[in-house]
Design a protein with these regions (language model features):
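N-terminal secretory signal peptides that target proteins for export/translocation
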Residues: 1-10
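Negatively charged
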Residues: 30-584
Length: 584
């Protein structure tokens, strides 16, 4: 990312303030602005407008709109009595009247986000429009009009800014929620600009087609340029992005951005190291990125998160990305909720044993058409598998039985909603896994043999087999002594009736809904140590056959037991010795 100067650093120049008393002589005649001046229109609600800029040679005049004759330009004078030390001009105004401000000369710095707080107390909302750009040279437009929510540039705005000395347009229009266009004539020259960091961030109405031909050949940072510009859908495939290194969050939240023509960037993005959230939330994005040269990338997480239509027009083959992920350590959420991605070509991605990837969290989560054969993937170094295949409803797990997952720490939700899951994972080494939460939730046909799994490191088994209606696996040798959370572990496992008598439950705190809906369950769990359990709410609800003798259970701090045995038609254990004094 290109370094950005603080709002407190203004470089050089003098600090001025000019107080102009305004006449109220009005005329219907339109104002004739000085052709060299930067002209803006304001409508303040208070008694002054604060204009933060710095210049070596500026002359200014501020007057009520339609006033004739307009006052002469005044030489700005140093204002030294500002207790907040703001670098700004202040002009006296009458509330709710419209004013014209003309600034003539080169402007070294202009920022509506000046330090001290005065600007934020109302002036930003007073700026209505840029009437004319003038001929002065701009040196720094970082945050120039940031958060001016009423600012508009229209087809009648005269000229364009002289940016020959300007390298930084960061945050220039950030938060300008009324802004629709900026370059009505299509003549902005950006050849010397280095960064467009967050230039149009949160500009919810911005969609200027004239920026399509901007020459950004020297821009290095497109970080957050259009972030949350929800209306933006300009075809910018002609942009020269060959020097860009940072595209993180460039189009994040651009709900209407289709990415038309971005295939042309294929050979131009080879310097980009950061694709974090580039297209996050671009729900209508539908271009083919498979030929993009991503060989320099180090960060690619969330790149296509929630890109619902990606791959809708044709099946995307990502085989060209193979061998180009050598610097990446995480593929987390890369294609999350890309429901049209089949995974074609990704079979070739992780063939090198020495790759650096340690996280596959939710990489294909929500890819409902995903069915790639990942037999050849080396996942030896991966620690985080959380949600990897979550909601991949067509995925059958082909080939992953041979994966070496010995370094895995999290497998929560890994196969949630994988109704087609058929692969037998009995030989997986899960001895380091702490998080099994929802791992196989909503896999109604699950029948895998887990009897040899070493789950001794497990901290949470919450919802692990939630909704696995056919599951009745042998778990008697599982060491669950470290786990605190068993919430809904076997919820609606209608066939489950495994022997759990050996389970050591000394660390258990939450067993609520643990066997809820287990119609066949009647295992002997009378020897369980439940002294630390605080929540047993609905623990056996709907266990129609359950009648274990739980009279020896001892609770020290049981706080919830609502509906604990509701629907247990044959349960008749004597629970009079239970300590329920803490139950709320």
């Amino acid at each position: 990312m290109v370094n950005r100067k603080s709002h407190w650093e203004w470089g050089y120049g003098c600090l001025f303030s000019l107080w102009l008393l305004l006449g109220v002589v009005c005329s219907a005649k339109a104002a004739n602005y000085d052709v060299n001046a930067f002209v803006t229109k304001w409508k303040p609600t208070g008694t002054q407008i604060v204009v933060p800029f710095e210049s070596q040679n500026a002359q200014v005049r501020c007057y009520e709109a339609n006033t004739t004759p307009v006052p002469a330009f005044g030489a700005a004078q140093k204002y030294s009595n500002d207790p907040k030390n703001n670098m700004c001009f202040k002009f006296s105004t009458t509330p709710n009247k419209t004013y014209i401000l003309e600034i003539k000369g080169d402007i070294d710095k202009f920022s509506m986000s000046a330090p001290g707080g005065e600007v934020a107390q109302g002036t930003v909302n007073a700026l209505l429009s840029i009437e004319q750009w003038g001929t002065g040279k701009w040196r720094n437009l970082n945050s120039a009009f940031a958060n001016c929510i009423n600012l508009e540039i229209s087809s009648t705005t005269k000229g364009e800014p002289d940016l020959t000395l300007c390298e930084d347009l960061s945050y220039m229009f950030k938060g300008c929620s009324s802004l629709k266009i900026v370059d009505p004539q299509g003549k902005w020259k950006l050849q010397n600009v280095r960064t467009l960091l967050a230039m149009f961030e949160d500009c919810s109405q911005f969609n200027d087609p004239k920026i399509a031909n901007w020459d950004i050949r020297n821009v290095e940072t497109l970080n957050r340029t259009f972030c949350r510009a929800t209306s933006f859908n300009v075809k910018i495939d002609n942009w020269e992005v060959g020097k860009v290194t940072n595209m993180s969050q460039t189009f994040q939240g651009c709900l209407n951005f289709k990415g038309e023509g971005l295939e042309k960037w294929a050979t131009k993005v080879n310097r980009v190291t950061n694709f974090y959230c580039t297209f996050y939330g671009c729900k209508t994005l539908n271009f083919d990125p498979t030929d993009w040269n991503i060989e320099s990338v180090t960060l690619i997480t969330y790149m296509f998160y929630d890109c619902w239509l990606l791959g809708a027009s044709k099946n995307l083959d990502f085989s060209n990305w193979a061998g180009k992920l050598k610097k990446v350590t995480s593929l987390s959420n890369l294609f999350t909720n890309c429901s049209n991605i089949t995974g074609q070509g990704v079979e070739q991605w992780l063939l090198d044993k020495n790759h650096k990837i340690v996280s596959l969290e939710s990489t294909f989560s929500g890819c409902k058409r995903f069915k790639a054969d990942l037999t050849a993937w080396h996942v030896d170094n991966v620690e985080n598998f959380y949600g990897l295949f979550n909601n991949c409803i067509e995925y059958d797990g082909k080939g992953i039985a041979k994966w070496k997952v010995g370094n895995a720490v999290s497998m929560g939700a890994m196969f949630r909603y994988c109704g087609n899951m058929k692969e037998d994972l009995k030989d997986w080494d899960v001895s380091k896994v702490k998080n099994f939460q929802g791992m196989f939730a909503y896999c109604p046909g699950l029948k895998t043999d887990f009897s040899k799994w070493d789950v001794g490191a497990g901290i949470t088994f919450r919802k692990m087999f939630y909704g696995c209606s056919s599951f009745n696996g042998d778990l008697q040798n599982w060491d669950v002594s470290q786990s605190t959370d068993f919430y809904a572990m076997f919820f609606q496992c209608a066939s489950f009736n495994a022997d759990l008598s050996r389970w050591r439950m000394r660390s258990a705190i939450n067993t609520s809904s643990m066997f809820s809906g287990c119609k066949a369950f009647n295992a002997d769990i009378s020897s369980w140590n439940v002294e630390n359990v605080t929540d047993a709410n609905a623990m056996f609800i709907g266990c129609e056959k359950f009648n274990a003798n739980l009279s020896r259970w001892r609770f020290k701090n049981l706080q919830r037991m609502d509906n604990m045995f509701n629907g247990c038609k044959v349960f008749n254990a004597d629970l009079r010795r239970w300590d329920v004094s803490h139950v709320k």
